[in-house]
Amino acid sequence: MPSDPGPEAGSGWPGLLMSCLKGPHVILKMEAMKIVHPEKFPELPAAPCFPPAPRPTPTLAPKRAWPSDTEIIVNQACGGDMPALEGAPHTPPLPRRPRKGSSELGFPRVAPEDEVIVNQYVIRPGPSASAASSAAAGEPLECPTCGHSYNVTQRRPRVLSCLHSVCEQCLQILYESCPKYKFISCPTCRRETVLFTDYGLAALAVNTSILSRLPPEALTAPSGGQWGAEPEGSCYQTFRQYCGAACTCHVRNPLSACSIM
């Protein structure tokens, strides 16, 4: 006969009591969750993200084609007529450098205010009689080139740009010596007088101050005609550069009757 087995583990009253106390087995399903620390990811906002507040758009001033009355353009402001701005510091203007005179620049001659330059000669206003006589007294009555005395027919004195006078016959020879460049070299100072017009030597003024001091016999035409004993000295031959085709004077008329001269 088999022997009676002893009480099994968990069996008997103690095991029954323990099984009653344990109750039914409950299975709970746990989900895995990962905890992220914010200091490892600074781009993740810790607080709830809200859109930024809209900023007011600045209003742009309309462009002006012309500056206003109170606006100063430095490069265009000149003189002492600039309006003073309120609150702007006033700085004294820089001292201007004195301009060099004509003598310092190599031009010793200072033209007077009432001097008028007409073509190649200078016309000065008529001074008093004493001043005019003293100024004209220093001018010679003879041509510096040929040495002949001036007269009103063939040897009228004409003024060059250097204010020296030469008779018309000598000027004709000097003018024909360089017809290409149309300039005359003064026989006294060697300065050149350029003729810019088509009138030739007629563009040079007659020195009336010398004519007023000539003797009476130099103011009349010779007895043998306008040219005296010089048959080759006709109006067209000698003074063709002055009159040209428009000359209206003839052999018996004085040269002053020419409409161009």
Curated annotation (Swiss-Prot):
Any single Gene Ontology cellular-component annotation: cytosol
Gene Ontology terms describing biological process: protein autoubiquitination; protein ubiquitination
Zinc finger (RING-type): 143-190
Region (Disordered) residue spans: 83-106
Disulfide bond residue pairs: none
UniProt keyword terms in alphabetical order: Metal-binding, Phosphoprotein, Zinc, Zinc-finger
An example molecular function term from Gene Ontology annotations: zinc ion binding
Signal peptide range: none
Annotated positions of the Phosphoserine modification: 102
Protein name as it appears in the record: RING finger protein 208
Source organism of this protein record: Homo sapiens
Name of the coding gene: RNF208
